[in-house]
């Protein structure tokens, strides 16, 4: 699944959220297999499917960097990537962003955006997904709270990412 949208007030537009709320009905995206919370965050009905978010921003890339004024784009979109896409089991690819979209005016800039998108799509089925911690992978023994021994130095959103350097 590819979701493409402009970033509006630091999130997806309301119409996209409305679509998710209507399509992700009980028994499908949540409440899967008799409604228990056993099959979620990596193990839902969409396990094995891939998802990619292509977002267009008004500001430059620097605004969405690790120390940018708007905050990292990956963290801004965490409710979508981790919540709406990973929750029902999808392998979520790193976000593709077109920054300063409204200011792309020359043919060269347009071609650069198109070229970057082509390259991104070439890896749609081979690129590594975001290494979110799965609910049933051992890091959440009660399915709700991360075990104390798992990345004790991390809190917040980054704690939900597997530290690949430790593996």
Q: What label would you give each PLM region?
A:
Residues 63, 67-167:
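Glycine-rich phosphate/pyrophosphate-binding loop and the adjoining helix
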Residues 1-81:
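Helix-loop-strand module that forms the ligand-binding subsite of alpha/beta enzymes
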């Amino acid at each position: 699944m590819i979701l493409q949208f402009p970033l509006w007030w630091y999130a997806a537009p309301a119409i996209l959220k409305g679509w998710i709320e209507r399509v992700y009905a009980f028994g499908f995206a949540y409440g899967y297999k008799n409604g228990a919370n056993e099959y979620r965050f990596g193990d839902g009905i969409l396990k094995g499917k891939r998802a990619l978010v292509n977002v267009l921003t008004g500001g430059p890339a620097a605004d969405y960097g690790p120390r940018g004024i708007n905050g990292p784009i990956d963290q801004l979109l965490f409710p979508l990537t981790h919540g709406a896409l990973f929750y029902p089991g999808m392998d979520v690819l790193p976000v593709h962003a077109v920054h300063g979209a409204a200011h792309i005016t020359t043919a060269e800039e347009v071609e650069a955006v198109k070229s970057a998108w082509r390259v991104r799509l070439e890896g749609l089925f081979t690129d590594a997904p975001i290494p979110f911690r799965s609910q049933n992978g051992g890091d959440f023994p009660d399915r709700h709270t991360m075990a104390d021994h798992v990345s004790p130095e991390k809190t917040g959103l980054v704690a939900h990412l597997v530290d690949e350097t430790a593996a």
